[in-house]
Amino acid sequence: MPNTKSAEKALRVADANRQENRRAKSQVKTSLTKVKKLVDAGSLTEAEAAAVSAQSTLDKAAEKGILHPKNAARRKSRLMKKLNQAAK
C-alpha cells in the first residue's frame, strides 16, 4: 500500500501504463498471428493487406516505446520474408 499521495498517484499511473502496454502488445501479437494464418491458408491477397496493417501496428508500438525499434524491424522483416516465400 502506498503511504503518500504521490505514491498513490504513481501506482495509478503505473497501472494505466501497464494496461496500455499489454493492450498494444496484444494487438501486435494478434496482427502477426492473423497474417501467419492467412499465409498458411494460402490467401495471399488478404495476407498482404493484413501485413500492411501489422507493419503499422508494429511501427506504432515501436514509436510509443512499447517495443524496441530493432525488435519491431526484426518482426517486420521476418513477416515479409514469410509472405514473400509463400508468394513464390
Swiss-Prot record:
TM regions (residue ranges): none
Family matches, as InterPro entries: Ribosomal_bS20 (IPR002583), Ribosomal_bS20_sf (IPR036510)
Protein name (record): Small ribosomal subunit protein bS20
Keyword Cytoplasm applies: no
Keywords recorded for this protein, A-Z: Ribonucleoprotein, Ribosomal protein, RNA-binding, rRNA-binding
HAMAP family: Ribosomal_bS20
GO cellular component, one term: cytosol
Domain of life, source organism: Bacteria
Sequence ranges of Basic residues compositional bias: 71-81
Lineage: Bacteria, Bacillati, Chloroflexota, Dehalococcoidia, Dehalococcoidales
N-terminal signal peptide: none
A molecular-function term among this protein's GO annotations: structural constituent of ribosome
Record PANTHER family: 30S RIBOSOMAL PROTEIN S20 (PTHR33398), SMALL RIBOSOMAL SUBUNIT PROTEIN BS20C (PTHR33398:SF1)
